[in-house]
Amino acid sequence: MGNVCFRPSRSHVSQEFSQSEFSTASPVRTSERPSDASLDAGLESSSACHRSGLRGPAKHSMLSLDEIGLVGAARWPDDAPGLNISNKSNTQENKRYCESLYQAARIAGGSIASGRVTSFDGLWRNATKWRLSRILSGDASKIDFATVRMPNTRFVTSLRRPYHSVIERVRNHSDANSEIYEGEYLGGIETKVYRQHGTISSTTIPMTIVSAVADDDDIHERLKSLPKNERRHLKDLMAASHPNMITHTDAVYLPMIKDHLESLYLQAIDPSLEQHEALELIARIHWWAASAAPDRRGSAAKAEFAARSIAFAHGIELPPFEHGAVPDIEAMLRSEEQFVEDYPNLFERPPQ
């Protein structure tokens, strides 16, 4: 096994670890609630947009200020004020983050429509630039948000809070199979496993693996069997070897996936597309980018940034995702076709 890299919690941070160590939230920059002027900033003129044939963003936002404050928020199923530590979408800090994503994606949509962003790689660079702008320069982990994952590194997300709601979903997933876990400390425990695959030019590639112990009592009994003085130490060590885990797409497949995203992008910026056709391609791009998780940090936010930017280029506004729908998690728990079918219904209301 190569190095183990833990995906971040939704406090806008992550870090690479060799053991079960997790970082705290890094500070983000503040900004004022957007005015009409700031929402229009950076948009291309209507004549520039016309040169590409794409409409570009509407002159004025079709979302309310409350909706803008939820664009890009990770709205976990248990995310409600005062409910538990997963709650972040209602904080002022998170609203500023969401407003920033909305404005930056709107500007990027104008750049797509004007012909200045001609590739998915260029759009991803825009997304990365925006994401880096939300991190203070003194944060030592900032470089991870601009670093592509390397092959032979096992990249995982532990299903601890705020990801714990995924456990029940994989247990009940219609395409999850029962397997016997082979980890170092919890080997032999029955586990439910969903294995995601993608297809590019008739080639099927393995992607995200989401797993969860079938019965919590099996974990508790195993821990109870350990000497008391070893339990806490082993609990920490088990974070990298635990059945409750998302194991992300092997980085060896990233070049192939990136080429596929370039092809999808060129299809998605065709000005002749009807709205439903554009949304289908946007959903495919969102699925591949989120499920691939190409960067060490920030891939989920960048995937949503890309989807919203392409929508803006077509004059389409995507509302916030509905409460309980965290888009990258929704992507990782679905096949491409299922995600495309469900995509319009994952928003609070229909895109317009």
Swiss-Prot record:
InterPro entries: Avirulence_B/C, Avirulence_B/C_sf, AvrB/C-like. Residues 15-57 are annotated as: Disordered. Disulfide bonds: none annotated. Keywords: Virulence. The keyword Transcription regulation does not apply. It comes from the Bacteria. Residues 15-29 have a biased composition (Polar residues). It holds the Pfam family AvrB_AvrC. The keyword Nucleotide-binding does not apply. To avirulence B protein of the same strain. This is Avirulence protein C. It comes from Pseudomonas savastanoi pv. glycinea (Pseudomonas syringae pv. glycinea). The lineage of its organism: Bacteria, Pseudomonadati, Pseudomonadota, Gammaproteobacteria, Pseudomonadales.
